[in-house]
A protein has these predicted regions:
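Membrane-embedded alpha-helical bundles that constitute the cytochrome b-like, heme-associated redox core
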Residues: 1-195
Length: 195
């Protein structure tokens, strides 16, 4: 399998970004729903488990920039037999996914009042950063006023919009695979190559 994209398929790097991001995104959801369903999220016992959610979210968020750069410098596989409207919709849907992959980790980090511990180092909570200090000084907004709307965005998007966007992405991939039989799904599967 080539490491760069071709007009026929995604390369190994694009597939690695896709499946690593998907796995981290799904795992972050599994972890946070474990906390919601089986733990008291205000308990100190929940903090190490929530930290796993935060680390996974950071993996998703920090991988978006190199993923976008890789997408911009590589050719994208051709859209098979798509109308202008379908091609536009596919393009808009992919950029919508990128917005989601940025928005969820960003609002999650900003709205968390605890450090994210990666083991070898810890990322301070947003409240302790120079950026928030500047926001607080510049606009005179306290953490107590700043954090709740950001946290609300994270929860609304996470509990509703993200599920819809991901479900539409999976449904579109399955539509291409089952109905169209055009190879759109298989060209993103790991280990597959048209060559």
């Amino acid at each position: 399998m080539p490491w760069k994209n071709t007009t026929m398929e995604f390369g190994a790097i694009a597939k690695l970004f896709h499946w690593t991001g998907a796995a981290a995104f799904i795992a972050a959801y599994a972890v946070v729903y474990y906390v919601i369903w089986f733990m008291d999220d205000t308990s100190p016992d929940a903090l190490p488990v929530l930290n796993v959610h935060w680390v996974l979210g950071m993996i998703v968020g920090l991988s978006v920039l190199p993923r976008l750069l890789w997408r911009l410098v590589n050719v994208q596989p051709d859209q098979p037999h798509a109308s202008h409207a379908e091609a536009w919709l596919a393009h808009a849907a992919h950029w919508g996914l990128y917005v989601l992959l940025i928005l969820m980790p960003l609002t999650g980090y900003i709205g968390t009042d605890a450090a994210t511990d990666f083991g070898a180092f810890a990322l301070p909570n947003f409240r302790e950063t120079a950026l928030f200090g500047w926001i607080e000084t510049r606009w005179g907004i306290s953490w107590e006023a700043f954090e709740p709307p950001v946290d609300a965005i994270h929860h609304v998007v996470g509990k509703g919009i993200a599920w819809i966007v991901v479900a539409l992405h999976v449904a579109a991939a399955l539509f291409h695979h089952v109905v169209r039989r055009d190879g759109v799904l298989t060209r993103m599967l790991p280990g597959r190559s048209v060559a």
